[in-house]
From Swiss-Prot:
Residues 178-217 are annotated as: Disordered. It comes from the Viruses. Its main location: host cell. It is found in: Host cytoplasm. This is Phosphoprotein. Belongs to the rubulavirus/avulavirus P protein family. Residues 206-217 have a biased composition (Low complexity). The keyword Phosphoprotein applies. It comes from Human parainfluenza 2 virus (HPIV-2). Essential component of the RNA polymerase and the nascent chain assembly complex. Also required during RNA synthesis. Also plays a role in viral growth by promoting host RHOA activation and thus actin formation via ARHGAP26 inhibition.
């Protein structure tokens, strides 16, 4: 972007006065009506042959050298129209108003000199009335992009202009504010016409200022990172759920292990109790009668080691005992007499047997019979006999 020049107030005033003076100088010159050709008086063809037509009717040509006429080369680019009476509030919204005191990118004028007598064509720079008018308009007016209605052309041929065929020249567009564009000389493509022209600049549309900020991070990268984090979070939640299930299963396994240990201990206790019951009361097999068991009984020698408890005494000569000097001697006793047993409290044993009869005997009449016997028993041996009978009946 071209650097914007700065001017002081005094410099701006001087430029304005100089431009106005130049414009007034050229506008105040008299115009000779017979020295120019009218539009209707120019027939189709080469302009050089018209010197004998309309120019011949004008004032006589001086004998001195003829001053070359200048020909305008007009571009068909769309010029800006002057908007002196459009207030700012009636402009479109967000339309910036350029500063009329800033220099605009205007090309230098072009000129083509045609010698009417000799027909020679010369080119050079032209900085005349048109540039003065443009300077005044630049300093005092603002521009809009409305296209003016041109009356210089013909209705049948829009490309026809005074001075010959139009010449188009692409101008380089500027960026941002108006920049300076240097003009270039263009050779006329037509030898017709006597009116000098200046190429018009291309229209410069009003542009809105744009703020330039640093480019943010790529939205695609941010989206990928967020999706990756969401995926990791989902996988982490899945792993946590599986770990919780594993911990719950392990706790159940530990509880089962403890219960199995308790069951093993209980089974061992029951087995011990059953073994104790068998040792204390082996009873009699149900398939062997008592008479057969009694027949199998016969007398056998019995050896008692150690001192006797005094529960019984041996009588008769069929027993051998040891005296004080540990000598075996025949005993004079012939039979064994048992001493009377001491009386004991049998209430607890009776209650135990009653509970055993209620649990093991299912028939009511048998149960009542055993309960009557338990209540009538007076010795411990009778209660033991009743207990054996209850166990046999239960088996």
């Amino acid at each position: 972007m071209a650097e914007e020049p700065t001017y002081t107030t005094e410099q701006v005033d001087e430029l304005i006065h100089a431009g106005l003076g130049t414009v007034d100088f050229f506008l105040s010159r008299p115009i000779d009506a017979q020295s120019s050709l009218g539009k209707g008086s120019i027939p189709p063809g080469v302009t050089a042959v018209l010197t004998s037509a309309a120019e011949a009717k004008s004032k006589p040509v001086a004998a001195g050298p003829v001053k070359p006429r200048r020909k305008k080369v007009i571009s068909n680019t769309t010029p800006y129209t002057i908007a002196d009476n459009i207030p700012p509030e009636k402009l479109p919204i967000n339309t910036p108003i350029p500063n009329p005191l800033l220099p605009l990118a205007r090309p230098h004028g072009k000129m083509t000199d045609i010698d009417i007598v000799t027909g020679n064509i010369t080119e050079g720079s032209y900085k005349g009335v048109e540039l003065a008018k443009l300077g005044k308009q630049t300093l005092l007016t603002r521009f809009t992009s409305n296209e003016p209605v041109s009356s210089a052309g013909s209705a049948q041929d829009p490309n026809f202009k005074r001075g010959g065929e139009l010449i188009e020249k692409e101008q380089e567009a500027t960026i941002g504010e108006n920049g300076v564009l240097h003009g270039s000389e263009i050779r006329s493509k037509s030898s017709s016409g006597v009116i000098p022209g200046v190429p018009q600049s291309r229209p410069q549309l009003a542009s809105s200022p744009a703020h330039a900020d640093p480019a943010p991070a790529s939205a695609e990268n941010v989206k990928e990172i967020i999706e990756l984090l969401k995926g990791l979070d989902l996988r982490l939640q899945t792993v946590e759920g599986k770990v919780d299930k594993i911990l719950a299963t392990s706790a159940t396994i530990i509880n089962l292990k403890n219960e199995m240990t308790s069951l093993k201990a209980s089974v061992a206790t029951v087995e011990g109790m059953i073994t104790t019951i068998k040792i204390m009361d082996p009873s009699t097999p149900t398939n062997v009668p008592v008479e057969e068991i009694r027949k199998s009984l016969h007398n056998v020698p019995v050896v008692i080691a150690g001192p006797t408890s005094g529960g019984f005494t041996a009588e008769g000569s069929d027993m051998i005992s040891m005296d004080e000097l540990a000598r075996p001697t025949l005993s004079s006793t012939k039979r064994i007499t048992r001493k009377p047993e001491s009386k004991k409290d049998l209430t607890g044993i009776k209650l135990t047997l009653m509970q055993l009869a209620n649990d093991c005997i299912s028939r009511p009449d048998t149960k009542t019979e055993f309960v009557t016997k338990i209540q009538a028993a007076t010795t411990e041996s009778q209660l033991n006999e009743i207990k054996r009978s209850i166990i046999r009946s239960a088996i």
